[in-house]
Amino acid sequence: FDDEVTRHTLYRNLRDPYAREWQNGNSRWDIIDMVRLTYALRPEGINWPRKEDGSPSFKLEELTVANGIAHEAAHDAMSDVEATIAVAKLIKEKQPKLFDFVLQNKDKHSARAMLDTNTMKPVFHISAKYPASRGCCAMVAPVAEHPTNKNLVIVYDLREDPSELINASADQIRERVFTSQAELGEGVSRFPLKGVQLNKCPVLAPANMLSTLSPERLEELALDGDTLRANLAMLRRAPDLPAKVAEAFDQPHESDLTDPDEQLYAGGFISRADREKLNWVLEQPVETLGELDVTFEDNRLQELLFRYRARNYPGSLMGEELERWEEFRSQRLMHPKKGWRSLEAYAQDLQRLAADPELSPQRRHILEDLHLYGESLIPYI
């Protein structure tokens, strides 16, 4: 979530949305799946909180309480960051080999090396898509490359009998992957296929890392060796399956995102030539922004530049530009399209939050400030 907010903020302000993630040796890492892997394979030394149904809870605020980690204000950004670092340190202390393994294999090249669709070599995979009652884990077989996304490999959960999948057509596979269980109805289950995003720090491990688990632990995670091997053998005896699965995942995607503010991903990467022009714009004195004569290859950028000026340097707008901006603001705040919050809905949300009798004085003060901010917009629309 934080990455998405940061990326979009940078993008809308003409900055490179990705540079901070790779320049100067930087990289990204989301440790939640490492926490889940630790629970599944090396839980010793850590207290694992449980939900009412007995399944493990991986909520940060519950992990910190169970392990005596200071976390004074759950969901406060800085407090959450400090607590997350403390949980990572706990795992590094209690299970250093596992910690180092995940850290060293978090990039997409390591993930690619583990997911061999030619041999369908089984891989242990961690994902919130698998139920917590089963440790959020599965032994999967890499079945097919995604037909259009080179950073996505489609895998199959080897716990499940693949007979129906093997006999299904591409259209039937598509229906039983992308249709909700509620819509499929009783007696028809979704096929346990999922995409592994290579560039999103997936947590994968060789199958032999399970060799130290006791029979009781394997049973708890529903990882029966005979079942896994039998299902893998069936997949390998279906030579036409990878092509059918790839076809099923080949869905034309018509983006309904037409507003440049929303088109960080829908519009593709900004070209090097346009990036150089944007960097040049950012270097210009504020008083000259209204006089710049710059054009871009990317059709998003002219409007983004206009909005950048309007939001940050409204004094750079002249004549028709001012009218255009006020018309845009009025439309966005009073009659927004689906997905955007109107000023009226904003006020209603604040009122609903303020009605909470347990709201702290600090949070109530924040809501009052937000209410005043909303009111300050009214004279201009």
PLM regions and their residue ranges:
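Structured mid-domain segments that build the active-site/substrate or prosthetic-cofactor binding neighborhood
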Residues: 177-223
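C-terminal non-catalytic accessory extensions
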Residues: 324-381
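Sequence-level motif detector for i,i+2 pairs with an aromatic at +2
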Residues: 26, 150-153, 199
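Metal-dependent phosphoesterase core characteristic of DEDDh/y 3'-5' exonuclease domains
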Residues: 1-96, 105, 267, 275-316, ...
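Acidic catalytic cores of enzymes that act on phosphate-bearing nucleotides/polynucleotides
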Residues: 93, 104-188
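Conserved DEDDh/DEDDy metal-dependent 3′-5′ exonuclease domain
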Residues: 1-42, 205-281, 377
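Polar helix-capping/helix-linker motif
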Residues: 95, 104, 224-225, 234-238, ...
